């Protein structure tokens, strides 16, 4: 219901795909992914196979972690002009969004597969059992995506701090919004 309402709010709207809107759409995307993977976890016959595996880790962190971050970033990009009277750098915002979005799915999408392969969570090493040796390369890929995602957050911090002092001064209503906040 929530997803349908979010999508129909955008329907026939005059969308401006600025970083705030991209993060908002990304939030809806992660909720859709979470809803689809949640069906598997909600079905007891399927949940037996993926219970306490990386599938659960991927589902939970994609839905709860990434969605929360997307909401936070959307809010910061949208309300920054109101808070500081300056605009954040839009190009750095686009870089921040696309690198974060690709890396978020690059981290958590493969986790679904290694979870379906049976890799349990809470193991200090995946090479404790010979069966899991084939999954080590996927974990290396996940680690690389996670490190790149961390670097994207450094871009955000730079954009935030630099724009606070040196960003382009904004007009009274930078988003041309008709709501009372602006």
Report the location of each language-model feature.
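Short, small-residue-biased leader/transition segments that mark boundaries at the very start
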Residues: 1-3
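Extramembrane terminal tails and long inter-domain/linker segments of multi-pass membrane proteins
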Residues: 117-134, 161-182
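Repeat-solenoid scaffold signature
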Residues: 134-166
């Amino acid at each position: 219901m929530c997803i349908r309402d979010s999508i129909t709010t955008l329907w026939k709207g005059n969308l401006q795909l600025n970083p705030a809107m991209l993060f908002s759409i990304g939030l809806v995307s992660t909720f859709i992914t979470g809803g689809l993977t949640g069906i598997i976890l909600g079905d007891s016959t399927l949940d037996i196979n993926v219970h306490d595996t990386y599938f659960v880790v991927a589902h939970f962190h994609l839905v709860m972690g990434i969605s929360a971050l997307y909401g936070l970033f959307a809010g910061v990009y949208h309300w920054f002009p109101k808070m500081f009277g300056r605009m954040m750098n839009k190009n750095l915002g686009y870089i921040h969004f696309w690198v974060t979005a690709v890396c978020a799915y690059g981290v958590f999408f493969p986790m679904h597969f290694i979870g379906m392969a049976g890799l349990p969570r809470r193991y200090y090493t995946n090479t404790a059992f010979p069966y899991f040796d084939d999954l080590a390369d996927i974990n290396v890929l996940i680690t690389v995506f996670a490190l790149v995602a961390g670097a994207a957050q450094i871009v955000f911090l730079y954009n935030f701090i630099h724009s606070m002092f040196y960003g382009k001064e904004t007009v009274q209503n930078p988003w041309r919004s008709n709501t009372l906040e602006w």
